[in-house]
Regions:
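Surface-exposed loop/turn motifs in large extracellular/passenger domains
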Residues: 1-41, 45-112, 116-179, 183-240, ...
Length: 369
């Protein structure tokens, strides 16, 4: 067993604060403080370990390509504080195992991740990342980053029992540009998108400090993956998207997406075999925003409620070869005179359609618009 109750400060590159394998008990205790001052360093490294490695103290990485905790076939848990300062770093990075954050992860460098789960070995298997409970907060402060990131690599053998899961029941706050709350990429051609899944049961907020903080995504199913929102996504940055499914991915909204900033999109389906399905509520409050967008052969379906209060807002926008459907159970409410229920652009051919089988309601129920 390795327990740190004091201060560990490492000056060199490729340093490790606490290391253990096999049946090691690794613990940075409540009074423990690990600081890594050079690049490619790790606070706690657990390898092929049957025991869970725990951080109950403070871990700080000061340079690039570093991780607060790294588990290679070793489970990780953070119940206190992890901060990464420079690029290409991860708060918690796990391969073929499980990482659980229950408290604070702060990411200050670009191209980084709060929790990163990966499958790359030929054997496949399972990997998972969890941001668990109301005290769990992941904050992203620099571009090109993800609160939670999951990847299945093509090096995994075809036919293996392989699943990768990300779950958030806490808070993910994105305070930058070109970043995502939760992101998944499945590079294994034979692996079904249902096996690579991200679910939000908490709150994802894309929040802006300046107008340059734009083009963020709440949940990105980047390739052959599934994204599910079962709680709240707040889109408060310009030109940003609540949920995006591309490259044969699916995204499903089962609760609430709030679009507050201009030129936002609630749900976007892009590319062949990609779908976006709204099963609850999308609130379109930002100017020139759309509840759903289907483009380049993607399909968007509204099965419940899209409420457009925004000026020049659109319920379902269908672009080029996309397909958009307001189904028989779908309702688009337009509470602004300049709003449009379903808008089709460059959709001349018979194959690519915008269809309304449900209700489009004009004006507020009280007749004030």
């Amino acid at each position: 067993a390795v327990t740190n109750k004091n201060v560990i400060t490492l000056e060199g590159s490729k340093s490790t604060g606490i290391f253990g394998e096999n049946k090691s008990t690794l613990l940075n205790d409540a009074t423990g403080n690990i600081t890594l001052k050079d690049e490619a360093s790790v606070g706690i490294f657990s390898k092929s370990n049957t025991n869970k490695a725990q951080n109950k103290g403070t871990i700080l990485t000061e340079k690039k390509k570093s991780a607060g905790m790294f588990g290679s076939k070793g489970e990780l848990e953070n119940t206190n504080s992890i901060t990464t300062t420079e690029e290409e770093s991860a708060g918690m990075y796990v391969e073929h195992s499980k990482a659980t954050n229950k408290k604070t992860i702060l990411i200050k460098g670009k191209a980084s991740a709060g929790v990163y789960a990966k499958l790359s070995d030929a054997t496949g298997g399972t990997a998972s990342g969890e941001n668990e409970g109301t005290d769990a907060v992941i904050t992203i402060e620099k571009e090109g980053s993800a609160g939670m990131l999951g990847e299945v690599k093509s090096t995994v053998a075809t036919g293996t029992a392989t699943t990768l899961t990300l779950t958030n029941s806490g808070n993910i706050n994105v305070k930058t540009k070109n970043s995502t709350g939760m992101m998944l990429t499945n590079d294994l051609a034979s692996l079904a998108k249902d096996n690579v899944k991200a679910e939000n049961n908490g709150i994802i907020t894309l929040e802006s400090t300046t107008k340059a903080d734009n083009k963020n995504i709440g949940i990105l199913a980047n390739k052959k993956a599934t994204g599910i929102n079962s709680e709240t996504i707040n889109v408060n940055t310009l030109e940003s998207v609540g949920m995006l499914g591309q490259a044969a991915s699916s995204v499903v909204n089962k609760k609430t997406i709030n679009l507050s900033a201009e030129k936002g999109i609630g749900m976007l389906a892009k590319d062949t075999d990609s779908t976006a399905t709204n099963e609850d509520t999308i609130n379109v409050n930002g100017k020139q925003s759309s509840g759903m967008l289907a483009q380049t052969a993607g399909k968007a379906e509204n099965k419940k409620s899209i409420i457009v209060t925004a000026e020049s807002g659109v319920g379902i926008f269908v672009s080029d070869t996309g397909t958009g459907v307001n189904t028989s159970t779908g309702e688009i409410t337009l509470e602004n005179k300049n709003a449009v229920g379903i808008f089709a652009k460059n959709n001349g051919t018979t194959d690519h359609t915008a269809e309304n089988a449900g209700k489009i309601v004009l004006g507020k129920a009280d007749g004030s618009t």
